[in-house]
Design a protein with these regions (language model features):
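Predominantly soluble domains enriched in secretory-pathway, periplasmic, or organellar proteins
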Residues: 1-285
Length: 285
């Protein structure tokens, strides 16, 4: 889900061919329905929306938000996930996530695409496989999760300076991430097929120094509640109240929950949702 402009919200309906458009009051108005297996969204904040798709060996679709029609595409790596628009370029995280079922290997690259011409300019090899999930952005800095292979290759966190296209790798996952001020708040979920267990970690990264602190900093009290959750599924901080919200997918087949915490990490509310797997929150004034 993404705020395209002051009056339009776009939602990529996971594992479908549909992007649903709505007003901020929740009224659905139209849809783009011809992007198979669509994934993540980015916008230039003006006239265009960009969507990654796992179909056709992996591509990005460019949509004119005035007509809701696809006007161009660009092939990138296999199974592209996160996408961000920065300074006329698109940064696209390639996963190769279907590697276990197909003949291609996992991807470890970030495709850089000219947003105007929709031509791939380069691929930056991070050396970290399976760049899976939504990305967090703070100014020119981008936080990307490398999920590994759940066996021998451990998950990692990749942080890129999009202005210089330089990056740094950290030895912990950033499965769920958000930006607040000049910091990234990171929840890592490390799963092992060998043991069948999840391990949850938390870190705060200061920018631009990339200094890392274990835990959630001033929200340290949140970890007590996260440890009780069945399946932590997202972390978000309101830019208006500084409240932190953590979602719990629970069993992935029943109603999810959202936990609200104060700016000092005190639990304020728990919300039981109608839907399952609450993975995104959009804040509006």
């Amino acid at each position: 889900i993404i705020m395209v402009n002051d009056t339009l919200i776009a939602v990529s309906v996971n594992w479908s061919n549909i992007i649903q458009y709505m007003y901020p009051d929740g009224r659905a108005i139209s849809a783009t329905e011809n992007i198979p297996n669509n994934r993540r969204l980015a916008t230039d904040g003006e006239n265009y929306l960009y969507c990654t798709s796992y179909a056709d060996n992996g591509y990005v679709a460019k949509i004119d938000i005035r007509t809701k029609e696809i006007v161009d595409t660009c092939h990138v790596g296999h199974e592209p996930e996160g996408i961000v628009y920065f300074d006329g370029r698109l940064f696209v995280a390639n996963t190769g996530g279907y590697a276990p079922q197909t003949g291609h290997p996992y991807e470890s690259t970030i495709s850089v695409v000219d947003a105007q011409t929709m031509k791939e300019l380069k691929r930056i090899d991070t050396g970290c496989i399976n760049l899976y999930g939504a990305m967090a952005r703070s100014g020119q800095f981008l936080c990307i999760n490398s999920a590994g292979d759940n066996y021998d290759v451990a998950p990692r966190c990749v942080v890129m300076n999009m202005a210089s296209e330089e990056f740094q790798v950290f030895d912990f996952p950033a499965t769920y991430a958000c930006a607040y001020g000049n910091e990234f708040y990171l929840l890592g979920s490390r799963y092992s097929y060998t043991t069948g267990n999840y391990n949850i970690s938390a870190h705060v990264m200061e920018l631009p120094s990339m200094r890392v602190e274990q835990g959630l900093g001033r929200y340290s009290g949140v970890m007590t509640e996260i440890d009780k959750m069945q399946s932590p599924y997202g972390i978000f901080i309101s830019p208006y109240s500084a409240h932190m919200y953590v979602t719990d997918a629970r069993g992935n087949v029943t109603n999810g929950r959202v936990y609200e915490f104060s700016a000092s990490g005190e639990l304020l509310n728990k919300y039981l949702l109608e839907g399952i797997n609450p993975g995104k929150i959009l804040f509006m004034e």
